[in-house]
Amino acid sequence: MNAVAEAPVTEDVPAPFVFTDSAADKVKQLIEEEGNAELKLRVFVQGGGCSGFQYGFTFDEEVNEDDTTMVKNGVTLLIDSMSYQYLVGAEIDYKEDINGAQFVIKNPNASTTCGCGSSFSV
């Protein structure tokens, strides 16, 4: 009798980041305004700010070898390997309220965050 090997059962692995519809839609709008469909949103962490690290956002046409990518609503999010360790599990969102409009990162790895929300410590 021949035994048939079954494929291993795999569970859905959660994405390393949450890139909200609101953020993706705003990035899509900004890319359309720039007139360059090759642009991708790069989110990164660098030293600075009042808490030690700060978030940065920029458009980039290039995907580097060590980048983690996520596509949402036709928009590509890029995170480099150094920033990845600080951002894994984070939510990248876009909020509009009476105080203005801005991209917001909710980061479970941050032990403290400054009042403006643009810098953090781990």
Curated annotation (Swiss-Prot):
Its cofactor is iron-sulfur cluster. The keyword ATP-binding does not apply. Iron-sulfur cluster binds at C50, C114, C116. Binds 1 iron-sulfur cluster per subunit. GO terms for molecular function: 2 iron, 2 sulfur cluster binding; 4 iron, 4 sulfur cluster binding; iron ion binding. GO terms for biological process: iron-sulfur cluster assembly. Keywords: Iron, Iron-sulfur, Metal-binding. The keyword Iron applies. Belongs to the HesB/IscA family. Required for insertion of 4Fe-4S clusters. Homodimer. This is Putative iron-sulfur cluster insertion protein ErpA. It comes from Cupriavidus necator (strain ATCC 17699 / DSM 428 / KCTC 22496 / NCIMB 10442 / H16 / Stanier 337).
